Design a protein with these regions (language model features):
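Class I SAM-dependent transferase core
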Residues: 7-49
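Conserved Class I SAM-dependent methyltransferase catalytic core
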Residues: 25, 149-206
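Short glycine/threonine-rich catalytic loop with a Thr-x-Gly-x-Asp
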Residues: 33-35, 60-61, 203-204
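Residue-level signal for inorganic ion chemistry
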Residues: 42, 124, 155, 213
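Conserved SAM/SAH cofactor-binding pocket of Class I
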Residues: 44-116, 120-134
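Mobile active-site "lid"/loop adjacent to the S-adenosyl-L-methionine
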Residues: 125-154
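SAM/dcSAM-binding transferase cores
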Residues: 205-252
Length: 252
């Protein structure tokens, strides 16, 4: 019996999940790295144009690049250091018929040779400091979430080197580590353009923030906050729209 493409590409230890009402399909490890809520939020936050050349620093299973594929751009290069995740990301790109728009490169982003500059650079960086927090039994998940292979300072340095003069970079990062993020920015020529705090509930503290950076902004714009839940188990209308893949400008 002839196997369909899903069966050919899917590993035994993986699940097949759908997003944006089935427009995007992604294989994920059952016990290894699985993306979290910050991925679709960052994909929504990134703004693109049809001619954009884009670079992702640390793609994991490719989820962010694939969610971004519903937006216009010319080509996206996605870097991933872990062989298992790079392979998974490549299979996910093929699963979604995006081979002509997205290229996965297995490499250490700290030593990636930038042969050109990019219009857009984005990243959902590892956010747990070395020697802080509990390491997952899954080495794959630990490298994705802990600063074992690169730090926020490495991410910012590579972004500075990769971004065009008129380009823009986008990140999502824990609010508790904002000071580290700002120090990493200040070590480069990058400047914070927009910040949007993400709150679980209206009366809670932010758990992370979305931020855009460029080389020319003189004043930071604080965007209206994003609240995820109306109440426990019920997303706000905006969160539902983001999870459905509705394209909009978060700066509006």
């Amino acid at each position: 019996m002839k196997m369909n493409l899903d069966d050919q590409l899917k590993g035994e230890d993986e699940t097949l999940d759908t997003f944006y009402h089935g427009r995007i399909r992604v294989f994920q490890k059952k016990k290894g790295y699985r993306f979290s809520i910050d991925a679709p939020l960052l994909a929504d936050f990134v703004q693109t144009k049809e001619t954009d050349q884009i670079l992702e620093l640390g793609t994991g299973n490719g989820i962010l690049s694939l969610l971004l594929s519903i937006k216009p751009f010319a080509h996206l290069t996605a870097l991933e250091i872990q062989a298992s995740l790079a392979d998974l990301a490549q299979r996910n790109v093929r699963l979604n018929n995006c081979e002509d728009r997205i290229k996965v490169v297995r490499t250490d982003l700290r030593f990636f040779s930038v042969g050109k500059k990019y219009d857009v650079v984005f990243s959902n960086p590892p956010y747990i400091k070395q020697k802080a927090g509990h390491l997952s039994p899954s080495g794959e998940k630990s490298v994705a979430k802990h600063e074992l292979k690169c730090t926020i300072f490495d991410i910012m340095q590579r972004t500075e080197e990769s971004l065009k003069r008129q380009g823009e970079a986008y990140f999502v990062y824990p609010a508790i580590r904002k000071e580290d993020f700002m120090r990493a920015i200040h070590d480069t020529r990058l400047k914070v353009r927009n910040i949007r705090y993400v709150f679980p509930y209206r009366d809670s503290e932010p758990n992370f923030f979305l931020v855009s950076c460029d080389f020319s902004t003189r004043e930071v714009q604080l965007l209206r906050p994003l609240v995820l839940y109306e109440r426990e188990g019920e997303y706000t209308k905006e969160t539902q729209d983001i999870f459905s893949g509705r394209i909009h400008d978060p700066t509006d």
